[in-house]
């Protein structure tokens, strides 16, 4: 049996479970069509001569799940691609203890769960997986509506109109003059009567003392 076919068969028969030895990030990612995606698998053990495999599962994990072998990283050969894989879209490289799966120009059919895996003796060790969702349009977040503030209306009192022209009409002016004349006449009469009374009092006193 060819090694790659054996690998796929082993992945089908092995119970799939997340392991702390291989930590995958992020757990979920949603990207737009034709974008680039980088999935990380960090090994918590020394993998000097061990290969890291990347598999894809297009449906939710189950007993009938099918795993596609995409590529592996080999310390001597670098990236080795699986059969019927677009090699120009998939690359695997190492960055210290992390193994990166790089996907370019992703399409909606690339959506699925991506697992990194190492082959032990005899067990297989899987990461917890990264779910990739490729969509044509990313959802837009609605902007919070701003409350409109009501402006207070300022009531302004009408300005008093300045009177143009003469302040007093001729009739009013005539009445004022007449009133002044009446006061003067009354004052003159009062003074005259007062003087006459004084003279009469003086004459009476002179007659009394004779």
From Swiss-Prot:
The modification Phosphotyrosine is found at residue 209. CDD domains: IgV_CD8_beta. Disulfide bonds join 41-116. The keyword Repressor does not apply. Phosphorylated as a consequence of T-cell activation. InterPro entries: CD8B, Ig-like_dom, Ig-like_dom_sf, Ig-like_fold, Ig_sub, Ig_V-set. One of its GO terms (biological process) is cell surface receptor protein tyrosine kinase signaling pathway. The chain crosses the membrane at residues 171-191. One of its GO terms (molecular function) is coreceptor activity. Forms disulfide-linked heterodimers with CD8A at the cell surface. Interacts with CD3D; this interaction couples TCR-CD3 with CD8. Interacts with LCK. This is T-cell surface glycoprotein CD8 beta chain. The gene is CD8B.
């Amino acid at each position: 049996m060819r090694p790659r076919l054996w690998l796929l068969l082993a992945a089908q028969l092995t119970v799939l479970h997340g392991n702390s030895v291989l930590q995958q990030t992020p757990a979920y990612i949603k990207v737009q069509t034709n974008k680039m995606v980088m999935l990380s698998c960090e090994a918590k053990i020394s993998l000097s001569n061990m290969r890291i495999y990347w598999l894809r599962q297009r449906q939710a994990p189950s007993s009938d799940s099918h795993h596609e072998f995409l590529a592996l990283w080999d310390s001597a050969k670098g990236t080795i691609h699986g059969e019927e894989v677009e090699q120009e879209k998939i690359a695997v490289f190492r960055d210290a203890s992390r193994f990166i799966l790089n996907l370019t120009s992703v399409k909606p059919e690339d959506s699925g769960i991506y697992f990194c895996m190492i082959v032990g003796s005899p067990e297989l060790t899987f990461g917890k997986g990264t779910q990739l969702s490729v969509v044509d349009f990313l959802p837009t977040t609605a902007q919070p509506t701003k409350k409109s503030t009501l402006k207070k209306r300022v009531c302004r009192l009408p300005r008093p109109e300045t009177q143009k022209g003469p302040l007093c009409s001729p009739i009013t002016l005539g009445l004022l003059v007449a009133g002044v004349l009446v006061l003067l006449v009354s004052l003159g009469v009062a003074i005259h009567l007062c003087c006459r009374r004084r003279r009469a009092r003086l004459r009476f006193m002179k007659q009394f003392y004779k």
